[in-house]
Curated annotation (Swiss-Prot):
Assembly behavior: The complex is composed of NatA and NatB.
Keywords: Cell membrane, Ion transport, Membrane, Sodium, Sodium transport, Translocase, Transmembrane, Transmembrane helix, Transport
Induction statement: Induced by ethanol and the protonophore carbonylcyanide p-chlorophenylhydrazone (CCCP) and, more modestly, by sodium and potassium. Positively regulated by the two-component regulatory system NatK/NatR.
GO CC annotation terms, alphabetical: plasma membrane
Localization per Swiss-Prot or TrEMBL: Cell membrane
GO molecular function: ABC-type sodium transporter activity
Organism domain of life: Bacteria
UniProt-recorded name of the protein: ABC transporter permease protein NatB
Coiled coil: none
Gene3D superfamilies: abc type-2 transporter like domain
Organism this protein belongs to: Bacillus subtilis (strain 168)
Residue stretches spanning the membrane: 19-39, 172-192, 226-246, 273-293, 300-320, 353-373
Length: 386
């Protein structure tokens, strides 16, 4: 009888176009948008910045700035106002006596004006600052050469910064932030329509009484409904993961480096599949419990909005942390553990202890919410329409 109930609920759900829309199309559109957004953040290609000046620059300095492909030097009558009005990204203020000051070794000041709050202006200021530093070093080196002084006198050592994981770097950080959020949000949105309809909807239609009058036990009815909701949650999560991987690998250049998992690939896939299934079972139990407690679909929808935000909040707590900084406590906090685990997996860190801790925490929550849903489902005051 359990299989018959499960099959009935699945058939009823698949007849609803809204279910298919929220299970497939909405996650697909959302993922495509976020993938291209984060890819554009990682890629600086095609970005052009306007550098305002008040007069012509010294030839050597102008040549140094022209070597930067992203910078276009433009003369304005009022360059500072041009930056304030958005006509230019930054303003370089150098004295007209630049060359004479350099030749006479007279110290002087160069101003780089911009708005660090604006990303374009901030990038332009950094590029100009870097070019000025290089040009300043060249002048110093030339002066030392003229005085027959070895450059090592003022440069005893050089500094070279290296990333711990240069191959993945920023792309893995970006994906580790959006991957768990997208998967969990897809599970929530995929399971929600059927969870709303399967209990609160039947109360609105007053069809729940007929189901309860059948000889099937309420426990089997509840399990059948829960498995049906979970199936849509799992399908949404798997589809979200597969589509995210495909869209990232096929349509991006920077983000796809995060999926270079090497020997850990199958371990990561297996752990991800386990977490998706457990997350779907948990979210489905939560949504089913809310649907049973609610007297109508409208009331259930207001409560469900709280569930939608659960996958998002943890991202802000771990975004700035490296995956090797998580202690065991991170994997015992619901939903935060999912974000932490996916971040470790994307960096190729497959730790059985963290996987078991996360799975165990989710399993305990599944049992709690299912038992709460069962306790309410066995009482007529929660099941029968008011």
């Amino acid at each position: 009888m359990l299989s018959h109930i499960y099959k009935k609920e699945m058939i009823d759900a698949l007849r609803d176009r809204k279910t298919i829309l929220l299970t497939i199309l909405v996650p697909m559109i959302m993922m495509l948008g976020l993938v291209f957004f984060y890819e554009s953040m990682l890629s600086d290609k095609g970005e052009q910045y306007t550098l305002a000046v008040g007069h012509s620059l010294p030839p050597a300095l102008e040549s140094k700035l022209n070597e930067i492909d992203e910078i276009s030097v433009k003369t304005f009558a009022k360059p500072e106002e041009a930056v304030d009005e958005g006509k230019a990204d930054a303003y370089l203020n150098v004295p007209k006596e630049f060359d004479s000051y350099v030749n006479s070794m007279t110290p002087f000041k160069v101003d780089v004006y911009g708005n660090s709050i604006d990303q374009g202006s901030s990038n332009a200021m950094q590029l100009v600052q870097s070019a000025l530093d290089q040009y300043k070093n060249e002048i110093v080196q030339q002066r030392l050469t003229n005085k027959h002084i070895d450059q090592s006198v003022i440069q005893p050592f050089t500094i070279q910064q290296k990333e711990a994981d240069e191959e993945k770097g920023t792309s893995a950080i970006m994906l580790s932030a959006i991957l768990p959020m997208l998967i969990l949000t897809s599970i929530v949105s995929g399971a929600m329509p059927i969870a709303l309809d399967i209990m609160a909807g039947e109360k609105d239609r007053k069809s729940i009484e007929a189901l309860l009058l059948t000889p099937v036990s309420r426990n089997k009815v509840l399990v059948g409904k829960w498995l049906a909701v979970s199936t849509f949650g799992v399908a949404s999560g798997v589809f979200a993961l597969v589509f995210l991987i495909l869209s990232t690998v096929l349509f991006t250049e920077n983000l796809k480096t995060a999926f270079q998992l090497g020997d850990h690939m199958w371990s990561v896939i297996g752990a991800s599949a386990l977490i998706i299934v457990l997350s779907a079972l948990l979210i489905s139990a939560m949504e089913l419990f809310i649907s049973i407690m609610s007297s109508s679909v409208k009331e259930a929808q207001s409560y469900m909005s709280l569930v939608v935000f659960l996958p998002v909040f943890p991202m802000f707590f771990i975004f700035s942390k490296a995956p090797n900084q998580f202690d065991l406590s991170y994997f015992l906090i619901p939903f935060l553990n999912l974000h932490a685990l996916f971040k470790q997996l994307l960096f190729g860190m497959v730790d059985p202890a963290t996987i078991l801790s996360t799975s165990g925490t989710i399993a305990v929550l599944i049992a709690i919410f299912f038992l709460l849903a069962r306790a309410c489902f066995l009482k007529d005051k929660w099941v029968l329409p008011k």
